[in-house]
């Protein structure tokens, strides 16, 4: 009796989560990100484009040396975290490199903010990008 009640409770909870809009990735989000990345002109928009660049991408490197703004390690970590979370959401390796391009001042970074449901703090991230940017 107790096992049946627990099973029924789990089924009801899963069903309610499925109908409430709470969930992981959406097909709409994936297609929107793929469309955004495919419209990019840069060579790193291809899945293996980051391998053809002249410099290697160091996983531990927190900041982009091309960014001429304020150097704040915590600020770079915060911006980089958005790109890493976006990669974890879509599992496409080129998202991380494309998201970091131009000192995070690009459409992919903005799309990642939207897809990670950070639109309520987007102004804070925009000002952070301007601080580290060129």
Swiss-Prot record:
Keywords: Amidation, Carbohydrate metabolism, Cleavage on pair of basic residues, D-amino acid, Disulfide bond, Glucose metabolism, Hormone, Neuropeptide, Pyrrolidone carboxylic acid, Secreted, Signal. The modification Pyrrolidone carboxylic acid is found at residue 61. Transmembrane segments: none annotated. Disulfide bonds join 67-103, 83-99, 86-112. InterPro entries: Crust_neurhormone_CS (IPR018251), Crust_neurohorm (IPR031098), Crust_neurohorm_sf (IPR035957), Hyperglycemic (IPR001166), Hyperglycemic1 (IPR000346). One of its GO terms (molecular function) is neuropeptide hormone activity. The modification Valine amide is found at residue 132. GO terms for biological process: circadian rhythm; glucose metabolic process; neuropeptide signaling pathway. The modification D-phenylalanine is found at residue 63. Stereoinversion of L-Phe (form CHH-B-I) to D-Phe (form CHH-B-II). One of its GO terms (cellular component) is extracellular region. Its main location: secreted. Residues 1-24 form the signal peptide. Pfam families: Crust_neurohorm (PF01147). The keyword Secreted applies. It is found in: Secreted. Gene3D superfamilies: Crustacean CHH/MIH/GIH neurohormone. Produced by the medulla terminalis X-organ in the eyestalks and transported to the sinus gland where they are stored and released. Present also in the ventral nervous system. Hormone found in the sinus gland of isopods and decapods which controls the blood sugar level. Has a secretagogue action over the amylase released from the midgut gland. May act as a stress hormone and may be involved in the control of molting and reproduction. Belongs to the arthropod CHH/MIH/GIH/VIH hormone family. This is Crustacean hyperglycemic hormones isoform B. It comes from Homarus americanus (American lobster).
């Amino acid at each position: 009796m107790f096992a049946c009640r627990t099973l029924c409770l789990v089924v009801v909870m899963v069903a309610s989560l499925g109908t409430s809009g709470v969930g992981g990735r959406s097909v709409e989000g994936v297609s929107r990100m793929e469309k955004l990345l495919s419209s990019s002109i840069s060579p790193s928009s291809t899945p293996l484009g980051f391998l053809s660049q002249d410099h290697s991408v160091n996983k531990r490197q927190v900041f982009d040396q091309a960014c001429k703004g304020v150097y704040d390690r915590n600020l770079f970590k915060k911006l980089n975290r958005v790109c890493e979370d976006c990669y974890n959401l879509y599992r496409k390796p080129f998202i991380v490199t494309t998201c970091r391009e131009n000192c995070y001042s690009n459409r992919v970074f903005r799309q990642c903010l939207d897809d990670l449901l950070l639109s309520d703090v987007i102004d804070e991230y925009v000002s952070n990008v301007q601080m580290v940017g060129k």
